[in-house]
Structure formats: structure tokens, C-alpha cells
Amino acid sequence: MSSFISYRMFLCSSMPWHAAIAIVRIKLLSLVLLLFSTTVLGKTANTEQAHIADTIHILPKTGLALYPLYEGLHDRLAVRYAYAVWQGKEGIRLPQYGLSEQRHSLYATGATRQQKWGAHGYAEYAHGQRTQVRSIAMAQPERFYPYIVLDTSKRALTREEYQLGGTLSYVWHDLGVGIGGSFAGTTQFGKKDPRPLARIGDFSTLLALSYRLSHYVLAAQGDYSYYSESFAQTNKKEDRQDYVYYHLGLGLYDHELSVQKRSESVKYIFAEYALTLQAAPQQRYLPLVQIAYNHNNAFGRTNLYTKIAETEEDKLQAKLFFPFIFSAQRLEVGVHVDYAQRTGYEIDYYTHQVNTSPNITEEREYHRVAAWKGIQSHYKAHLSYRYAMPSALFHLGYEGGLASLQTRHGQYYFEQRRSVQNLFATYRRYYAHYDWLFCLQGLWTQSVQKRVLWAREARFFAQLQNSIELYYNEPHYGLQATFEGGYRITPAQRIAFALTGGFERIGGSSEPAWLWELALRYGFLNRR
């Protein structure tokens, strides 16, 4: 669960925004690229306009990773550069994201559909900085717990990210098959100290199958992901570190584990398996059904290759959508359920002598206990209405639901439910060679139930607990607006300029968090 509007599900783009990241007094939210309008839309039919200009679509793509096989013959390329700034306050985001960020990012994606095969891929590089980062200095702490290093300093961190991925698919009669993969890397280091605090390698691979029936396309996709992070840190004399029980932003702490350490070096391993099944309609008024199961295992280990703690997590996701198409109008209604359960294990070791001459010893596990449990669920409803006019497109959407988070370690617990509501409206206007778009988004979250018992901790822990209480339990209000102007160089090429601004307020505070972003886009789309 994120805190800022643009960190939510509905954005003024055809893909979700990247998570916020990076610099001195600032933080970003990356608006990801639109599928570009590349025809003289003022002179085309409504159905063609709706397809090209559709920048917000809540329905999953038909065929999952094989989606190019179920589109018309085309070649598509989109490139986007963005510069974004975020300035916030305590409680708007979780402590590990800092109080301000700034980021530059360059993103490119492309796809092609030929007679017998299709392919799509993407690449991205981003460089950013964040300031006043307190607590956990890992790159992705939510993936690894119960063992997490908690740092009590406030740091200025620089973060570099890159990723590359894609899928190649082939169709034979009604059968489609595809293979794909991706690699992502992140390096995070202090602004004054160039030694890396964290290095990340994230590799994933997938295999997908699909089959076309008279009324449906059936698709199945299996994914495997392997993630590792090397983490090293040197502290000031007065700093403390703690091993944290952590669940999607929430830590429950055992003060008996708290230690004063000048340095720490840990390696984290994360492995994930996922299976997704989908039935996508090929005719009007039929529902889309999609279910997914995910299992992952994560642990941290020292330089002695000893597991400190380990977690097991199971996730279940279900989606049901009903699309209704009436000539120039389209209505989509759906429900979405997410459920995740994670268990953390504490591991104890004893020293075993393997050989006396020479003297060789090793650490052997002798005791494992399920000390930590966490459950998260999210129930959402979706509603989307789109109306295509001869030279314009109007789109209105809503996503709302109830999110629940429960964590427990020993006698300590944190239980919370909150209502999350998102609303967006988009209007796009087409001319012979120009077009413009205006998108307005609103966010509101409200805690409806909470129950918590914190351990009695030191002052810096109390500050961290206060930030978590603000984030989860105080109401959040936000508004964001995007204006984009585009020019068609040729019938197949388009360039665009977009400016985004927004704010978010927590509770009755008079100090909001501010966001602004500048984006430049180039798009190419050739339909055959």
C-alpha cells in the first residue's frame, strides 16, 4: 500500500507509475508512458479513436504476456524521459522512503505483431536521490523480514536503477506459446560515502501458453523470480541497529534483540514462484476471469553463510471483470481480491566441531520457531466508463475498497483496516495534427478500525512507531492533475510534453506534501 495518489492503481497512463524514489528535498513518482495516438484522429472512426487514445484501462491484457498475439498487426515504440520532485512530511510515506526525493528516468518500450509471432520488451535507467531517510536503509525492505537491519541515522541516499525485459511469442493455429524474462539491478549508496549500502540483482523468467476458443482466450503463465541483495553499513558510535519483524511497511520490534554495532554486512535471498490463469472474452458482455497463486521464500544470512531468519509467504489474487461495449461507449465493472499470509521463523544454531586436526567447526541449526505472523488482504471494486466522440475521448474511473493488515510477534501486535478510494477523470481532445489531454485524480484513505500493542522501546523507536501510526491510521487526502500536449510529426509518429502537479495532506495537518513532474514522450505506431 502506498501513500501518494500516483503510487496508486489508476494513473493517466497505460501502465502503472513506477514506485517513488530519490534526492535532496524531493521525491518522485514516475508517470509511465501512454500508448501514443499516431493517426490523424480527427478524421478517424470512433472505434479507432477509442483504441489508440485509451490511456487508462482497468482490464488485464488478453493472453497475459502473450498479448501481442491478440492485437492487430502493428509495430509500436514509445520512449519517455521524466524529471520528478517530491517534498513531504512525516507520516505521508513510510520512514525508509525519506522526506524528500528527486529523480531522472529514461524508459523505452516496444512491441511488434507479425503474422506468426509477436514480441514486446522494455528498458529503463533511473538515477535519483532521497534525503532524511530514517530507519531501514535497504533498497527493498518489504521483501525481507523478520531479519532487517534498522538504522537510527538520518541519511541522504543516492539510488541508481536499471532494468531490461521482454517476451517472444509464437502462434500456431489457435495455440500460442511464449518465453520471456527480465533483469533488474539497483545500487544504493550514501551521498557523502560512495561505498554501496546495498546492491541488488533481480532475475525473472516466464513461460506462457494460450489457446483461442470461439468465445474465449484461455491463457496460463508461470513465473520464477530470484532476487538477492548485498547490504553493508558502517555506523557512528552512537547509532544502534535492530533486527526487525517487518510486514509491508510495518515493523514489530523485540527490544531484547537491540544491539549497538559499528558495522553490519548481510546478504538477502528471495525466491518466488507464481502461476496465473486467465479466461478473456472475445465477444461482448462475457466476463473476464483471472486468478493467480504466488509462493515465495526469503532469508537473510551473515558472511558466515548462516541463516539468521527465514520467511514463507503465500499469496492469492482473483479478478472478475464485466466489459459492456455499446458502439462509442464502453463500461467496465469488476472486483479484485488480494490475500497474503507470511510466517517468519527464528533460527538458533550451535557450534559443531567437524575435525580436531586441523580444527574445523561449523554452525548447525538446532532450533526453529514460527515467531512472527502477518496477514494482509485487499478487497477492491472497479468501475470505468469511456465515451469516444468524433474528435474527443472522455474517461471516468473509480477504484475503492477495504484494506486489512494484521501482524503479530509474541505478545505484540498491530491490526488495522482502512478504506481506500480513488477517482479519476480524463478528457482528450484531437485536432488534425495536435491533441491535448487533461487528467484529474483524487485519493482518500480513512482508518475504520485499529488495534495495537507496541513494545516499550527507546526514544528513536517511539519516533518510528509514531510515523507508522500516522501513515496507517490518519486519514489521507490527495489531488493530482496532469496536462499533456501532443503533436503528430507524421501519421505514425507523435511527440508530447506532459506536466503533472499534486499534493497530499494527512489528517488535519496544514502542511501538505507536494509533487511535480515534467515528462517528454516520443511514440511510433504503425498499423498494418
What does each model-identified segment do?
Residues 77-87, 121-127, 170, 179-185, ...:
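Transmembrane beta-barrel strands of outer-membrane/channel proteins
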Residues 257-393:
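Long, internal scaffold/assembly segments composed of regular secondary structure
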Residues 512-528:
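Outer-membrane beta-barrel "beta-signal"
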Residues 41-131:
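N-terminal, post-signal peptide beta-strand-biased segments of exported outer-membrane/organellar beta-barrel
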Residues 90-96, 132-138, 189-197, 231-237, ...:
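Outer-membrane beta-barrel translocator domains and adjoining extracellular loop/strand segments
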Residues 134-148, 223-269, 297-310, 351-361:
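Short, flexible helix-coil linker/hinge segments at the edges of structured domains or between repeats
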Residues 73-80, 115-121, 173-177, 214-220, ...:
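Outer-envelope beta-barrel architecture signal
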